Amino acid sequence: MSKDFLLEIGLEEMPAQYVTSSVLQLEKRVTDWLTENKIEFGEIKTYSTPRRLTVLVEGMAEEQANRVEEAKGPAKKIALDDEGNWSKAALGFAKSQKVDPADLTFRDIKGVEYIYIKKEVIGEKTSTLLPNLEKVVTSMTFPVSMHWGSNDLRYIRPIKWLIAMFGEEIIPFEITGVTTSNTSRGHRFLGKSATIKQPSDYPNALLEQFVVVNAEERKQAIVEQLRELESMENWQIKEDDDLLEEVTNLVEYPTVLSGNFEKEYLELPEEVLITTMKEHQRYFPVFSQAGELLPHFVTVRNGNHENLDTVARGNEKVLRARLSDADFFYQEDLKMTIDEAVAKLQNIVFHEKLGTLTEKMKRVQKVALMLADYLDWQEEDKQDIIRLTNIYKFDLVTNIVGEFPELQGLMGEKYALLQGEKPAIATAIREHYLPNSAEGELPQTDLGSLIAIADKLETLIGFFCVNIVPTGSADPFGLRRSAFGAMRIIQANGWDIPMLEVISRIVDMERAEGSAELPGADVKKEVQTFLKNRLRVILQGHHIRHDIIDAVIGGDPNVIPQLIDRAQILNEHAEAEWFRPTIEALSRVVKIAKKYEDGVEVDPALFENEYEQALFDKLEKLKFDYAGLTIIERLKAFADLRTTIDAYFDNTLVMSDNDELKNNRLALLFELASFIKEFAQMDEINVK
């Protein structure tokens, strides 16, 4: 037999961004608890609003199933005394397992006998176990939490009521003075208390009190009302998943309404208007069918259709004040020149150990010019770099960015264009912040890409130099994001930038300017390791085998696009017939070459057979051709060497008793191994 079970945690209004993750956490914790307690159950449904987290478990067994359990005790040699009677250890084990010593048996495990017991455990009634769910509720963790009253519990918001019902039975427990019952609370203003007769009544009982407890149903109701308004007004209301998710978790009974603002505010940059509406007010912007922003907005009310005009006027008043402030900030910004803004940057500290923004921009300029040299950029391009790096952070001191930090870069682009900067420089000011997420948009221009890489690498290495590095999940300065973004941009552009050399030069620059606390060699090594770990993430995103990732990162990690190409090509050909014998042959060369002693050069006059000469000739051709070969051509060249390598080993004793011959042969293998290891550490690849 089974019954449904309902658990509702009633709270003061939670932050919208944590509602979904919190109810999913509750679902997992309840699921784990049921599994651990061997209680069978059917489907688990979740419900959530800003004021409640709920799970409804269908078909929960009324009692645990009877089961047979086994337990292993002490070894036989200590379970019996000298006279063959049970020892204290054996008797203690029997007592702990609640069995008669007569039921103890022995079982052989890998040649050693141990006490074993097999006992039948009678399942407990579920209703006697469910009060322990109190610990499940109190053990939940949240990104933000608080405590209230005189209790010690920290929770996302104060608990105001609790429901725990197994069928019609109330499961008793208490948390912070709140006792479980079968009574929930309806909408804060429109509803009343709702008595739940049985768990399956829960959604409808709350709906009668103006609460839509199913988050997906609330979301769908909002979408349908938005589409209806679009059709009625001939508008476009662009769906924004993040905004839709947030407003869904801000309301319990959604009603969509629209409002207006003065047309003159349309003279503000569109991004300022949209950000004001979306980020500050949680409004949906409205567009014409041609995609032009209109002087209207759409919002979602937590309530019904009564007095919508009054609600709309209230929202219009709030938005009007916001837009008036934005217009004032914008007009004030237009009075300030870029050079005046740049001068203020020397008063803004980037980090106490890394100086001001002005000092950071100067360091980034050096890095950007260094990268331009590696990429053979022209003098005109370098002049653009100099101008760009002299100003590219200027918008951080503008009023609009002070009010709307998410518009940094974007407002810099707009202000730069208004003041006559080159479009390429203006665009790069915006693009240097990209990508702003793991899968975010990348810069589309060369100049924007270069400054983004320079800024991110300087930030990363600067913090490493002063011993501020990510630890565990803590990364307050976004250094993982900086590294990941820089490498994504380098890969996308296919730029053969020698990363190890660049890292070394940036570390030396930071140390020369006094912003370093650690020895240069230590920092260089730490940054290289950090970037290699980010590369692993990129390669995993390309679904590269883990052993191949280890192999290419263990090879030459210097040029990122080439490294990624090598990994992809090895991965693509891993199932080819020739792949395994080729990797085995190359790995053999690498392993034996480790015995090479420095200073010995290959002397063809010491060759004793044609197979040594053949391998030498192939190596000389590889040396001549290698730089001009593509990645796939290099792999094919190694594959072509396989039969020559096999013949060499079949007919040549590398570790000869004659030291001169041995060292000459090791020198030949060492030269070949150098090319192989640059491509990848082939012995890391699993071909078994």
UniProtKB/Swiss-Prot annotation:
Q: Which InterPro entries match?
A: Gly-tRNA-synth_bsu, Gly-tRNA-synth_heterodimer
Q: Which residues cross the membrane?
A: none
Organism the protein comes from = Listeria monocytogenes serotype 4a (strain HCC23)
Tell me which SUPFAM superfamilies the record gives.
Answer: HD-domain/PDEase-like
Reaction(s) catalysed (UniProt annotation): tRNA(Gly) + glycine + ATP = glycyl-tRNA(Gly) + AMP + diphosphate
Question: Is this entry keyworded Protein biosynthesis?
Answer: yes
Report the top EC class in one word: ligase
Asked if the Swiss-Prot or TrEMBL record annotates the protein with the keyword Ligase, the reply is: yes
Q: What is this protein called?
A: Glycine--tRNA ligase beta subunit
Q: How does it assemble?
A: Tetramer of two alpha and two beta subunits.
State where the protein is found.
Cytoplasm
Q: Name one GO molecular function term.
A: glycine-tRNA ligase activity
Q: Which Pfam families match?
A: tRNA_synt_2f
- The UniProt record lists the EC number as 6.1.1.14
